[in-house]
Amino acid sequence: MIIPAIDLIDGQIVRLYQGDYGQQTTFDLSPQTQLQSYQDQGASWLHIVDLTGAKEPAKRQTALIAKLTAGLNANIQVGGGIRTEEQVAELLSLGVKRVVIGSLAVKEPELVKGWFNKFGSEAICLALDVNINQNGEKIVAVSGWQSGGGKSLESIVEDFSQVGLKHALVTDINRDGTLTGANTALYRELSSHYPHIAWQASGGIATLEDVAAVRDSGAAGIIIGKALLINQFNVAEAIQCWPNE
């Protein structure tokens, strides 16, 4: 499945290079118009990242997300700076279908597991951003990649499988925003080890060949941001390559 994505800082569409706020590109595009275009081309899921909220949780762009969600029929998945049960409940009440939880799942797993029990495993997607070291270990970074986490991807997946983990978005940090192609070996390995989880691939997508490679890796979906913004290909072409389930 193709999941077009936009990242938002202060209401504007941006891209960060490898998660670095110092390497930011701003696009002169309306978030509403952009998401509407993605929906019109056939996207059934859209992914919104609140980068302002990820950096400063007190400045979460909830009002904008509410407006965007209200204007769209597609399913919306939202991440960035979500720290409390109340925030999860608020987003779901606004019509967001799935909330993405990143750093907090690593730092406070028991808290987040409680949310799985309360809201159900369809309503939560874990975002696991990995640094793969020389030994091939997948170490999950936390806090918007600004600091290392030290837990292995596998240990987190095993832990959250106890509460029915169904959706996980995995980004190879070294590929993100680089347009160098996805780490398909990573998604192939995860899909074969944990077939009960719908893996979302993210990072490095540049061409329709990359989309096809991820499709064939066993991943359930692919998050595409930068490639669409710079017109490497469009959503309709991507869906032709990998139709929605």
Curated annotation (Swiss-Prot):
Catalysed reaction, written as an equation: 1-(5-phospho-beta-D-ribosyl)-5-[(5-phospho-beta-D-ribosylamino)methylideneamino]imidazole-4-carboxamide = 5-[(5-phospho-1-deoxy-D-ribulos-1-ylimino)methylamino]-1-(5-phospho-beta-D-ribosyl)imidazole-4-carboxamide
Family: Belongs to the HisA/HisF family.
GO cellular component, one term: cytoplasm
Keyword set includes Isomerase: yes
Gene3D superfamilies, sorted: Aldolase class I
Descriptive protein name: 1-(5-phosphoribosyl)-5-[(5-phosphoribosylamino)methylideneamino] imidazole-4-carboxamide isomerase
The enzyme's E.C. designation: 5.3.1.16
UniProtKB keywords: Amino-acid biosynthesis, Cytoplasm, Histidine biosynthesis, Isomerase
Residues the record marks as active site: D7, D129
Enzyme type, top EC level: isomerase
Organism this protein belongs to: Shewanella sp. (strain ANA-3)
Record bears the keyword Amino-acid biosynthesis: yes
Gene Ontology terms, MF aspect: 1-(5-phosphoribosyl)-5-[(5-phosphoribosylamino)methylideneamino]imidazole-4-carboxamide isomerase activity
Pathway membership, UniProt: Amino-acid biosynthesis; L-histidine biosynthesis; L-histidine from 5-phospho-alpha-D-ribose 1-diphosphate: step 4/9
Any one GO biological process: L-tryptophan biosynthetic process
Cell compartment(s), UniProt: Cytoplasm
Top-level lineage group: Bacteria
InterPro entries cross-referenced by the UniProt entry: Aldolase_TIM (IPR013785), His_biosynth (IPR006062), HisA_bact_arch (IPR006063), Isoase_HisA-like (IPR044524), Isoase_HisA-like_bact (IPR023016), RibuloseP-bd_barrel (IPR011060)
